[in-house]
Amino acid sequence: MTHCCSPCCQPTCCRTTCCRTTCWKPTTVTTCSSTPCCQPSCCVPSCCQPCCHPTCCQNTCCRTTCCQPTCVASCCQPSCCSTPCCQPTCCGSSCCGQTSCGSSCCQPICGSSCCQPCCHPTCYQTICFRTTCCQPTCCQPTCCRNTSCQPTCCGSSCCQPCCHPTCCQTICRSTCCQPSCVTRCCSTPCCQPTCGGSSCCSQTCNESSYCLPCCRPTCCQTTCYRTTCCRPSCCCSPCCVSSCCQPSCC
């Protein structure tokens, strides 16, 4: 018998209805065409396992990771969906790390496996955050809102100590600023890699004013000096000439 509307199964198999090309494999029904296509009434559920129930995922075979985002709770059966379910829309309106779907995602039952990395669900009213947001240890509620960190996230009330997000790519750090940070990013004591290396520079540090390691900018103006330069305690102006301090002066 001819195909009803190739590619699809034989009319006797699919009840005169053309199948979708992304549906069931033909291995379980010998009368189907070679193209992977069959209605659920033709093919047994084991055709494309693991997957969701055909009525949940629009009669198409589901991905091996589980259900489609449009699946409902009845879709995520333990036999067809593996944890986590319906990723990567964990924090949307679909599944959340378990075998059941729901409108609220990051419930306490999901824990840290819900949509890591993100804030703990008990910290942000079941709202998950992006990877560049808060640390899992929780911050102040005013730090993180919606799906991104506010500029205050890396301030004094959250993820201390760190620089302003505009300097450090919104990542809280235990050390200090990135080389691209400006002076206002660093509070005393704070290190400027381009200024003082592993030493902490003063709050008035200007990364364009001197090199590693160097004298204080108030001692030697804005001239870069060599490693055999002046001591941080300052020296008289004759010590700093050309591009290097005289050891005898310091």
Curated annotation (Swiss-Prot):
GO cellular component, one term: cytosol
Start-end of each Sequence repeat: 8-12, 13-17, 18-22, 37-41, 42-46, 51-55, 56-60, 61-65, 66-70, 75-79, 80-84, 85-89, 90-94, 95-99, 105-109, 114-117, 118-121, 133-137, 138-142, 143-147, 153-157, 162-166, 167-171, 176-180, 185-189, 190-194, 214-218, 219-223, 229-233, 234-238, 239-243, 244-248
Keyword entries, A-Z: Keratin, Repeat
Region (32 X 5 AA repeats of C-C-[CGSVRQH]-[SQTNP]-[PTSI]): 8-248
PANTHER family: DOMAIN TRANSCRIPTION FACTOR AP2-O3, PUTATIVE-RELATED, KERATIN ASSOCIATED PROTEIN
Self-association state and partner proteins as the record states: Interacts with hair keratins.
Similarity comment: Belongs to the KRTAP type 9 family.
Protein name, per record: Keratin-associated protein 9-1
Gene (name only): KRTAP9-1
